[in-house]
């Protein structure tokens, strides 16, 4: 015969358990089991974990997850505490920083709240960087701007400090971006028009961290965070057979940029009838294997899609591209309407002589470039002269400049008349000029639409392609990725999973 027992549970036992505190006091009863022993010594926090704990004033024995209410959003923290001071002075992101789920979101979390310490390049990372540079040099002949800058610095070193400041006005960042706009936008866009592809093209966009949307109009640029990136390869698909042979192009030849851009636009418009745009990313591997983790593969796909979308958005019209490029300069605290110092102007001309010389001469004469946003923005220089007349002669005389030019180009450009550059310029060279020409170059892609993206895996030792993974360009997939990135960077919401 069975017996039935009745129990009465006290009311306090029916209450929901209190949430655990975010420290080890809640686990005090377990301390005897968890305490270090001779067999089980204590594990100190890793250097990165220790940085996070120090930021929030917590001891080495504290749990690593500080209370969420004490955390500023990751992007705010990233631009206030960063091993690279430029991100604090010029808040921005890279495309790779948007790939928050490529390995583990918590790893990104600790990276940011550890103050984004600068990493010492590993041997494998250096190998990959060198490999990318070799691919670029094979496709695009160019002069290293640092070697030209070194020669310019030698000349400036013999001048008084006040004179140097005048000749380098705008600063080193303005010089760097101007060179990048010429080499990695203007020249690369022309290369695609003539050869069907280009490597290492600079692209950028703006991500609204509140809505998770990428800017697509002038009215939404100001609401977004600047995101920069370098696309490993932009190409036409299928490759235009015989296109490069029918239209030989020497990037060192002297170009009339106005007609050159008009001709390139006409060719690209014709090609758009039976070609599409493809962006590729090159991943280097030490061995003949490729990543198997789906999150890593998807991140590489998303990276290419960001580049493709940036290019498509910039190419929609010249005025949008111009405003977007001007905003990129402005976010770096550079006034695009202020002249670049003559020393910087000379260095840029030596580095990219064939591309820039005819435009330099047009500016010196006061000619318009037939690009309304730029022409309107710079007309005041024609009627209202700057404090000192702008001229390359303020830096060096023409014979000295020609000697410098010959050191890098031989006698290739010896017959080009540049005398007007050493007289008073009617329109000083400004960052706005580089934005204008880059905008016109990006407009070449107006009618070309992305249909696919591709990730190439290369063996860094043999130089061979191990595998190519192609994906259709899908705006919905990209929108999901950008919203996920904005949610993490703008508000910090993570899955807390290793994916």
UniProtKB/Swiss-Prot annotation:
What enzyme category does the UniProt record give? hydrolase
Q: Cite the cofactor comment.
A: Binds 1 [4Fe-4S] cluster.
The answer to whether the entry has keyword 4Fe-4S is yes
Compartments annotated for it: namely: Mitochondrion
Per the UniProt record, one Pfam family is: Exo5
Q: What does this protein do?
A: Single strand DNA specific 5'exonuclease involved in mitochondrial DNA replication and recombination. Releases dinucleotides as main products of catalysis. Has the capacity to slide across 5'double-stranded DNA or 5'RNA sequences and resumes cutting two nucleotides downstream of the double-stranded-to-single-stranded junction or RNA-to-DNA junction, respectively.
Q: How does it assemble?
A: Monomer.
Name the chain's protein. Exonuclease V, mitochondrial
The record lists the organism as Clavispora lusitaniae (strain ATCC 42720) (Yeast)
Provide the taxonomic classification. Answer: Eukaryota, Fungi, Dikarya, Ascomycota, Saccharomycotina
Gene name linked to the record: EXO5
């Amino acid at each position: 015969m069975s017996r039935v027992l009745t129990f009465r549970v006290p009311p306090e036992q029916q209450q929901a358990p209190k949430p655990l505190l975010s420290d080890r006091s809640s686990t005090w009863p377990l301390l005897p089991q968890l305490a270090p022993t001779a067999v089980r010594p204590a594990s100190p926090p890793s250097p990165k974990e220790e940085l996070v704990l120090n930021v929030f004033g917590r001891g080495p024995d504290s749990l690593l997850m500080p209370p969420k209410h004490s955390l500023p959003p990751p992007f705010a923290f990233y631009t206030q505490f960063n091993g690279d001071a430029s991100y604090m002075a010029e808040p921005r992101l890279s495309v790779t920083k948007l790939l928050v789920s490529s390995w583990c979101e918590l790893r990104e979390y600790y990276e940011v709240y550890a103050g984004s310490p600068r990493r010492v390049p590993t041997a494998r990372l250096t190998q990959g960087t060198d490999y990318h540079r070799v691919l670029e040099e094979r496709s695009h002949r160019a002069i290293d701007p640092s070697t030209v800058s070194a020669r310019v610095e030698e000349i400036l070193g013999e001048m008084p400090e006040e004179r140097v400041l005048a000749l380098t006005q705008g600063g080193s960042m303005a010089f760097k971006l101007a060179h990048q706009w010429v080499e990695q936008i203007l020249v690369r866009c022309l290369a695609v028009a003539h050869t069907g592809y280009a490597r290492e093209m600079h692209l950028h966009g703006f991500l609204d961290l509140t809505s998770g949307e990428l800017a697509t109009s002038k009215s939404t640029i100001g609401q977004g965070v600047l995101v920069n990136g370098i696309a490993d390869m932009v190409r036409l698909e299928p490759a235009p057979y015989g296109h490069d042979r029918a239209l030989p192009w020497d990037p060192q030849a002297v170009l009339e940029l106005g007609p050159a851009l008009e001709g390139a636009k006409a060719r690209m418009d014709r090609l758009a009838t039976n070609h599409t745009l493809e962006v590729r990313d090159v991943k280097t591997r030490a061995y003949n294997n490729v990543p198997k983790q789906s999150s890593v593969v998807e991140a590489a796909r998303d990276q290419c899609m960001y580049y493709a979308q940036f290019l498509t958005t910039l190419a929609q019209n010249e005025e949008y591209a111009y405003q977007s490029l001007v905003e990129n300069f402005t976010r770096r605290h550079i006034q695009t309407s202020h002249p670049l110092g003559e020393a910087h102007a000379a260095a840029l001309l030596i580095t990219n002589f064939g591309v820039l010389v005819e435009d330099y001469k047009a500016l010196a004469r006061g000619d318009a470039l037939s690009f309304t946003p730029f022409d309107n923005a710079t007309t005041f220089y024609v009627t209202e002269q700057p404090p000192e007349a702008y001229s390359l002669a303020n830096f060096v005389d023409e014979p000295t400049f020609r000697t410098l030019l010959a050191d890098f180009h031989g006698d290739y450009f010896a017959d080009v008349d540049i005398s007007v550059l050493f007289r008073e310029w009617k329109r000083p060279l400004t960052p706005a000029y580089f934005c204008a020409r880059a905008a016109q170059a990006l407009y070449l892609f107006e009618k070309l639409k992305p249909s696919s993206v591709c990730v190439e895996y290369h063996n860094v030792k043999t130089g061979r392609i191990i595998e190519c993974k192609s994906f259709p360009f899908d705006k919905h997939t990209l929108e999901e990725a950008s919203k996920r990135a904005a949610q993490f960077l703008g508000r910090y919401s993570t899955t807390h999973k290793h994916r």
